[in-house]
Swiss-Prot record:
Primary localization class, coarse: mitochondrion
Pfam families reported for this sequence: Beta-barrel_CAF17_C
Listed name of the protein: Iron-sulfur cluster assembly factor IBA57 homolog, mitochondrial
Source organism, top-level taxon: Eukaryota
Region annotation (Disordered) ranges: 403-425
Cited SUPFAM superfamilies: Folate-binding domain (SSF103025)
Family: Belongs to the GcvT family. CAF17/IBA57 subfamily.
Length: 425
């Protein structure tokens, strides 16, 4: 008989770790939480992100063994100088942290660690302690130091300008108080900028647009289908490809051994990613199914008065009786738009195996809930939901992404590796 779970806990087999329902779980969001549509240009201080400093002679090789992206250049074997997006996995290949990695100059690290570059690791602020524990667990005898940066040491900013591809001239090797990183998780999504403190005066040119709220950045991210932070990426349960980390440039499938690589490579070369995080739009049950915007993403309405489901709610077919089979999991939302983990062949017209698809364009999907006095939900409710595939995501899935660039040697090496893994299993 399986052990009983404590009230409010989550089974380890559940795909997403979610909080228990609260009394406000199904209430319409407050107006303050529903920002206006994102401006064409703007900048936001990301107070929900934090930085960890990693320095030392072994810092590059240490990171190389822990993250999904290739730290060392395959040709020159040199340490990187350009920031990049990457993930930390556990030994089972499940996602622990989504991060941006910023190489720093030796002088910034005090000049006492030889000529090895140091690194700043940007991570979900709520996960700093967990990532520090993860680094400490794998440090062993490596010559390195790590610490969480104090509040105010450096600020993380998101910057965008839809009218032009903004890029500051103040790169890390010109002005050490400023480090920039192209955010390539979606086309023309913008930049990350690290500033010493929050002093915008350090920049030789102003950031584009006006300073906006964190909810504005979150809305823009949701519309582009970008999950961020462990509330959205399913810590220790989701595969990195489920959260589109491959599409967003966070995985190097040609890289050598790193923690969690086996399942990642096996899924890439021999498996099919059947579920992915997609942007979704919510609408009332009596309303017609919404159409995407001209750019293929949901249409946001700041005036929406929908009753909203909580994170982790099941998505089912509207025609299904009772609970029905899950077509996806709702993740997060602002107003009438959000993110959901969707079964591609059920909720979209994507065919993964070349066989007949389960998708029916006339089919609609719903999220239903029942009254729960203990949770403060006075009455039952239901909203409909439709998923959208941003054009760059669809193109990657249909054309195989990086698989198109595999050589025969890559395929043979992957096949040999996965056969060995299966023998060990």
């Amino acid at each position: 008989m399986p052990p009983r779970l404590r009230p409010g806990s989550v089974c380890s087999r559940c795909h997403f770790h979610r909080r228990s329902l609260s009394s406000t779980a199904f209430l319409a969001q407050k107006q303050a939480e529903r920002p206006p549509p994102p401006p064409e240009a703007g900048h936001v201080r990301l107070v929900n992100r934090a930085l960890i400093s990693l320095t030392g002679a072994d810092s590059t090789s240490f990171l190389q063994g822990l993250i999904t992206q290739n730290v060392v250049s395959a040709k020159s074997r040199a340490s990187p100088t350009t920031p990049f997006y990457a993930g930390f996995l556990n030994a089972q290949g499940r996602l622990l942290h989504d991060t941006f990695i910023y190489p720093t100059l030796p002088e910034e690290n005090g000049g006492n660690e030889g000529m090895e570059l140091g690194y700043l690791i940007e991570v979900d602020k709520e996960q700093v302690t967990n990532l520090l524990k993860h680094l400490k667990k794998h440090k062993l005898r490596a010559k390195l130091k790590f610490r969480a940066l104090d509040e105010g040491e450096r600020g993380v900013w998101a910057v965008w300008d839809n009218a032009k591809n903004w890029e500051t001239k103040d790169t890390g090797d010109v002005l050490r108080e400023v480090i920039t990183c192209a955010d390539n998780r979606a086309p023309a999504f913008g930049y990350r900028v690290l500033l010493a403190g929050d002093n915008l005066q350090n920049l030789s040119q102003p950031l584009p647009g006006q300073q906006a709220s964190l909810s504005t950045y979150t809305l823009r991210r949701i519309l582009h289908g970008i999950p961020e932070g462990q509330d959205e990426l399913g810590r220790e349960s989701a595969l990195p490809m489920d959260s589109n980390m491959d599409i967003m440039g966070g995985i190097d499938f040609h890289k050598g051994c790193y923690l969690g690589q086996e399942l990642t490579i096996r899924t890439h070369h021999r498996g099919v990613v059947r579920k992915r995080v997609l942007p979704v739009q919510l609408y009332n049950t009596e309303d017609p199914k919404p159409m995407p915007s001209s750019s293929g993403i949901p249409v946001y309405s700041p005036d929406s008065q929908l009753l909203l489901p909580s994170a982790g709610a099941n998505i089912t077919k509207s025609s299904a009786s009772g609970k029905g089979r899950s077509a996806g999991k709702f993740i997060s939302r602002i107003g009438n738009v959000g993110l959901a983990l969707c079964r591609l062949e059920t909720m979209t017209d994507i065919s993964l195996t070349g066989e007949s698809s389960q998708y029916n364009p006339s089919e609609e999907f719903k999220i239903s809930w029942e009254a729960n006095a203990d949770a403060g939900v006075a009455e039952a409710g239901e909203v409909k939901v439709t998923a959208f595939i941003p054009p760059w995501v669809k193109d990657y899935i249909l054309h195989g992404g990086t698989r198109q660039r595999q050589t025969k040697e890559d395929v043979h090496r992957a096949k040999s590796g996965t056969e060995q893994i299966e023998e060990e299993d």
